[in-house]
Regions:
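Terminal alpha-helical segments
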Residues: 1-103
Length: 103
């Protein structure tokens, strides 16, 4: 498998993971578990953004790096409307509270 083929496989996998996480978020919301729905929605966005950036040749290994790239490469350049950056930031905040609440 060539590096380009491997990258295409990871992009496809990340895109599919995004769909899976989004479906999980919808189920949790319908089940009345909004905190878990927000956590799953965050991961849907995370995987979709990872696929987008990987397609552009950028590999990001940290949540904070992905968040920075979202704002620098998509929001500030006008490729994505500013409210979507706020949505992602809010989901990231909810995820952090959910994951680290017991600590």
């Amino acid at each position: 498998m060539s590096p380009d083929e491997a990258r295409a496989d990871v992009i496809a996998w990340s895109s599919e993971r995004s769909r899976v996480w989004l479906a999980a978020a919808e189920r949790e919301l319908e089940a009345g578990v909004p905190q878990l729905a927000a956590d799953h929605a965050y991961y849907a966005c995370f995987h979709l953004l990872s696929a987008i950036f990987l397609k552009e040749g950028l590999t990001l290994n940290r949540h904070s790096a992905l968040r920075s790239a979202l704002h620098e490469r998509l929001i500030q350049t006008g490729r994505l409307e500013r409210p979507w950056g706020s949505v992602f930031d809010r989901l990231a905040e909810l995820r952090t509270k959910s994951v680290y609440a017991a600590l």
